[in-house]
Amino acid sequence: MLIRLDKYLADMQVGTRSEVKELIRKKRVTVNDNIVTKPESKINTDGDSVNVDGNAVGYHEYEYFMLNKPAGVVSATDDNTCTTVIDLIKTNNRKDLFPVGRLDKDTEGLLIITNDGAMAHDLLSPKKHVDKTYYAKVKGKISDMEVKQFANGLFVDEELTALPAILKVLSYNSDKDYSEIHVTIHEGKFHQVKRMFTAIGSEVLFLKRITFGALPLDCLLYTSPSP
């Protein structure tokens, strides 16, 4: 792939676009052992050797981060009032990263951050029906009948009849009247899990995504607070 030298260096976190242009002008950058002074010079990412002050700078087109999103953080690239998931990637200066899908502000768990648009499309495409599993604490005791309702495809409201989902009851706390559950859905509608439990007369008290397709969140990271 051919790419401008200044973009190459900025993508690889050598500095901002203006900073790397200054490095180039000061003759601190070499390509294949030759000093290059034009920021617009084209670099072959598959074959050229780029060095800054004698240090090799390799290129990788795509980057992938698996994030355990905390509550209170928004699934966006930029926000004037709230911390975003991109803000949490503190060691990275790339400007083309984005979250694959979104989790509600109060929802925790697995979120993928990348600049790979093709992978994001495959994970989010409605035609793919990529599984997403959540751990939740929900109000009340979940019955076998409600498990079957989820399995048969739940009518949520006039805008949503959910595809068949797998609901597994883990435990019931009779003192505090809540159930711990795992639920696996095959689509990603707006507030879907919360709306599904509202439809059966329950309420989500805590929600954390623990798998996205074949990618699991480390089990040591998804303990939950008591409601």
PLM-predicted stretches and their roles:
Residues 91-126:
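Glycine/acidic-rich beta-strand-loop module
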